[in-house]
Amino acid sequence: MPKSLPLLDPAGTAACCPPLSAEPLSQAQAEQVAPLLKALADPVRLRLMSLVASHPGGEACVCDLGDAFDLTQPTISHHLKVLHEAGLLERDKRGVWVYYRASTQALASLAALIGDPRL
């Protein structure tokens, strides 16, 4: 005969397991954050975002990022463009090179979504 588990008192669970978020996302918040998460859903783009954000000086160009991947420069540029179009990266053209830096506003939106108190 299967053994049943005891039910927990919902009032008592708040002490051991605080909610992950103060309140659910509104429709507008979900629509704002969804494109950011969609852009980050690719492992290459997630890693590119991490590399740019942690790069010395807070910015990097394709020439700085190519050695970290077994991908062609045009492919890396495409992924950087997707991140830029989603608002995760800002860019600045200097001569023939385009330098990318993480958008602090987009990162703050993501941090608020996951409840990171540092941002």
Across the structure, where does each feature detected by a protein language model lie?
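A common structural junction motif
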Residues: R118-L119
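Alpha-helical residues within the helix-turn-helix
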Residues: D67, H78, H84-E85
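Recognition helix of helix-turn-helix DNA-binding domains
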Residues: P74-T75, L80-K81, V98
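Residue-level signal for well-ordered alpha-helical positions
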Residues: V52, L113-I114
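N-terminal helix-turn-helix DNA-binding core of bacterial DNA-binding proteins
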Residues: Q27, E31-T72, R94, V98-Q105
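Short, Lys/Arg-enriched C-terminal cap helix and immediately downstream tail that follows
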Residues: G87-E90, G95-V96, A111-L113
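N-terminal leader segment of winged-helix/HTH proteins
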Residues: M1-L40, A86
